[in-house]
């Protein structure tokens, strides 16, 4: 019985929301890889996405906190000599470090899945994740400022 935290980012609004994904919906994520796209209507019980929208898997992390790496095949854990992203940001150029990383495939040991909404081409409607109250107030203030 896998349970995931799905962090869904919306490029249109610049916002992200976190959802708790449990069975049977969580079973649909098992076996997917980084870069795979899922139909947005699968998540209709969590969030209302526009018709034709897709959800693209961009990464995640395991139960021990190790990030998923797109270059490691399968649902495995490996120690990798990392010198750049993803999963390691060296403080100095050229530095390398041995890091624990997960493979690119989602399994039941993954805790968090990162994903982004991919809108259909030519979509001009409202964003799937709306702006909050603070952002709306900021927009109103910026609209009022030039009118003075």
UniProtKB/Swiss-Prot annotation:
Belongs to the eukaryotic ribosomal protein eS6 family. It comes from Pyrobaculum neutrophilum (strain DSM 2338 / JCM 9278 / NBRC 100436 / V24Sta) (Thermoproteus neutrophilus). The keyword Signal does not apply. It holds the Pfam family Ribosomal_S6e. This is Small ribosomal subunit protein eS6. Transmembrane segments: none annotated. GO terms for biological process: translation. GO terms for cellular component: ribonucleoprotein complex; ribosome. GO terms for molecular function: structural constituent of ribosome. The keyword Metal-binding does not apply. InterPro entries: Ribosomal_eS6 (IPR001377), Ribosomal_eS6_arc (IPR020924), Ribosomal_eS6_CS (IPR018282). NCBIfam families: PRK04290.1-2. Keywords: Ribonucleoprotein, Ribosomal protein.
